[in-house]
Amino acid sequence: MMEPFRIHKGTAAVLMNDNIDTDQIIPKQYLKRIERTGFGKFLFDEWRYDNNRQENPNFPLNAQERKGASILITGDNFGCGSSREHAPWALADYGFRVIIAGGFADIFYMNCMKNGMLPIVMDKDMREQLAKTDAREQITVDLENEIMTTNTHRFHFTIEKMWKEKLLNGLDEISITMQYEQEIKEYERKVALH
């Protein structure tokens, strides 16, 4: 079972590039493990670090005031490319709980949900307003009411009911299956009789 997602408060990091693919999120050389943890240090690896593994001071996530951000505001078509689940793992391990983009690749969107992160589709004007939020300002994301607020703005977002219920209740595929444990046992009993 995942941790339920109801209300999240956090600061934002801004990376308004379009078409950020899963290889840019987490390069393929780091995908040799199947654990879900330990990938955050490789997030946006080729952008965050120089050839000597020193932080690139020009990369937005390396700005001191953006460290510890748990909300990522980004461009269109985020998470395109291959369907590796390691990309959401890296984002979550880094500390992101909410990703706000103009759109997401379908599989990436579902993988975010399956890993307890909330991907929000928001138009460019609203994302640009959010991006102007002071780096230290808390943004509140209220999933139940589908509202996001800053000190000066209030934004409405929508999410498909099925995904919303899964996140609100912390339900992953295993915990959903376990809700039908009795029915599964009954089916197995009937099949065994034939």
Swiss-Prot record:
Swiss-Prot/TrEMBL GO biological process terms: L-leucine biosynthetic process
Pathway assigned to this chain's UniProt record: Amino-acid biosynthesis; L-leucine biosynthesis; L-leucine from 3-methyl-2-oxobutanoate: step 2/4
Reactions catalysed according to its record: (2R,3S)-3-isopropylmalate = (2S)-2-isopropylmalate
Function (record text): Catalyzes the isomerization between 2-isopropylmalate and 3-isopropylmalate, via the formation of 2-isopropylmaleate.
Family: Belongs to the LeuD family. LeuD type 1 subfamily.
Subunit field text: Heterodimer of LeuC and LeuD.
PANTHER family attached to this UniProt entry: 3-ISOPROPYLMALATE DEHYDRATASE SMALL SUBUNIT, 3-ISOPROPYLMALATE DEHYDRATASE SMALL SUBUNIT 2-RELATED-RELATED
Name recorded for this polypeptide: 3-isopropylmalate dehydratase small subunit
Record organism: Bacillus cereus (strain ATCC 14579 / DSM 31 / CCUG 7414 / JCM 2152 / NBRC 15305 / NCIMB 9373 / NCTC 2599 / NRRL B-3711)
